[in-house]
Each structure stands twice: as C-alpha cells, then as structure tokens.
A protein has these predicted regions:
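Charge-dense, helix-prone N-terminal extensions
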Residues: 2-156
Length: 156
C-alpha cells in the first residue's frame, strides 16, 4: 500500500476590501444628498456643509451631475448659466474642482494660499486662459477652495 501525502493549502487571511474608487459610478443611479454626505468623515462633512451654505448664499444652484464612469456623480454648482465649481468624491476624498479664466486668476492671492492650494496650482491642468484646479477639501484645502471661488465670483 502506497501512502500519498497531501499538503494542506495554507489559506491567506482575508484582506479587507478596499473602498471603491468611484463613489457613485452608475449613471442610472444618482445618489441622494444623504448618501453623498454619509461617505464623508465628520470633520470633512462639516466643511462640506459650510461650503455648500456659502455657495447657496452666493446664489448658486446645486444639482447632481454625472461626470462619467471614471468620476461618477458629484455636485455641480452654477450661477445663472456659468459653472462655478464641482464637488466630487475621488478615491474616497472630497475634492473641489474649479476652472479659473485669466481674469479670475489675476484676482487670486496665490501667496496667501496654504501648501494644499499651492500644490493644486502646481498640478493644475488646462491652458493659461482656463486653468482647472483640483483642491482636496479635507483640512485647509476647504479654505483655499473658498478663496478660489471668491476670486471667480468677484470677476463676474
């Protein structure tokens, strides 16, 4: 009689699943305000609500907009027919996106921004005529984002 040894396979400990990279990826399923807010840590949620209140006081209309499968749903703020900014969840972080034309860029006190705002300017994309800045809204980024919005609102 021949004995065959069978090695037991070692099972790897189960890894926690990473958070989905796109918060709300399905075009047919827009989130509610409560679902969007539920994904934010408490301090970031407070900054987010302060920013939303500021935009509403400026007369901005707020709605959800689908930015595509790589970004998903996010907030779009408009005043009249002009887009002021977008606020999206990107890789689990709250990010504000604002486009500044040359006149608005001239209104920004770039030296007064924190390192977060300066980094956003360094990583900005677009053209000199229309610069797109992505600013993380956790921490001091929310203050920088508000300063950028004030510059955009001041010129038009």
């Amino acid at each position: 009689m021949t004995m065959v040894k069978v090695k037991a396979k070692a099972t790897a400990p189960e890894k926690p699943r990473p958070a989905p990279k796109v918060a709300f990826p399905k075009k047919a399923q827009p989130p509610t305000h409560a679902e969007f807010a539920a994904r934010l840590p408490a301090p970031v949620g407070k900054r987010f609500e302060v920013l939303r209140t500021y935009l509403q006081k400026q007369g901005a209309a707020e709605d959800f907009y689908f930015y595509g499968p790589r970004t998903g749903w996010g907030y779009r703020h408009m005043k009249d027919d002009q887009s002021l900014c977008s606020i999206v969840l990107s890789a689990g972080r709250l990010v504000g996106i604002v486009a500044l034309d040359a006149a608005a860029q001239a209104q920004v006190a770039w030296n007064g921004l924190s390192d977060v705002g300066k980094r956003a300017r360094k990583l900005a994309h677009g053209t000199p005529a229309l610069l797109w800045l992505d600013v993380p809204l956790d921490g001091v980024g929310a203050t920088d984002f508000k300063a950028l919005l004030k510059a955009k609102l001041a010129r038009g």
